Amino acid sequence: MAEASSLVGKLETEVEIKASAKKFHHMFTERPHHVSKATPDKIHGCELHEGDWGKVGSIVIWKYVHDGKLTVGKNKIEAVDPEKNLITFKVLEGDLMNEYKSFAFTLQVTPKQGESGSIAHWHLEYEKISEEVAHPETLLQFCVEISKEIDEHLLAEE
C-alpha cells in the first residue's frame, strides 16, 4: 500500500485575475468552445461529445498543446457549482492516461475580498502509473498560462 500512495498526488495553484469570478467560471461551463479563441497557441479546440455544456455527466473533448505536442483529452464533467464558481473535469481517455491511472482538474474561482478581480484556484488530483512518471508540474503551469490568457480575452470583450 505504501507504494501506491506515493503514486497518488495533488497539485494546487492560485492565479490572480482581473475578470469577475462568474465570467471566468462561465468560460469553462457555458463557453469552453470559446477558450481556443482566448488561448489559440495552447488550446486548439473543445468539442461537446455528449450531454450539454456545463452539465454534470457531459463529455467534452479538449485538444491542446502541452510540452510542445498536440494532446487530446476526453473529459467528463464531474461537478459544477455555480454558487462557488466551481467545475471539475475527470479525464476518461487521451494522452494523459498514458502516464496516469486517474486524473482530475478542479477550477474554483473566488471574488477578491474588498477589491475588484478574482482568484482562480486550480487543483489537480492524479494517480501515476509508475514512479518513473513525473508529477504534472508542467500541466499546472499550463493552467496558470491559460488562466492569464483567458483573463486578457475576457477583459478585451468588455
Curated annotation (Swiss-Prot):
Which key words tag this protein in UniProt? Answer: Acetylation
A Pfam family (short name) is: Bet_v_1
Q: Which Gene3D superfamilies match?
A: 3.30.530.20
Q: Does the keyword Acetylation apply?
A: yes
Per the record, the domain of life is Eukaryota
Keyword Kinase among UniProt keywords: no
One GO cellular component assignment for this chain's record is: cytosol
Q: What is this protein called?
A: MLP-like protein 43
The species is Arabidopsis thaliana
The major lineage groups are: Eukaryota, Viridiplantae, Streptophyta, Embryophyta, Tracheophyta
Name the encoding gene, please: MLP43
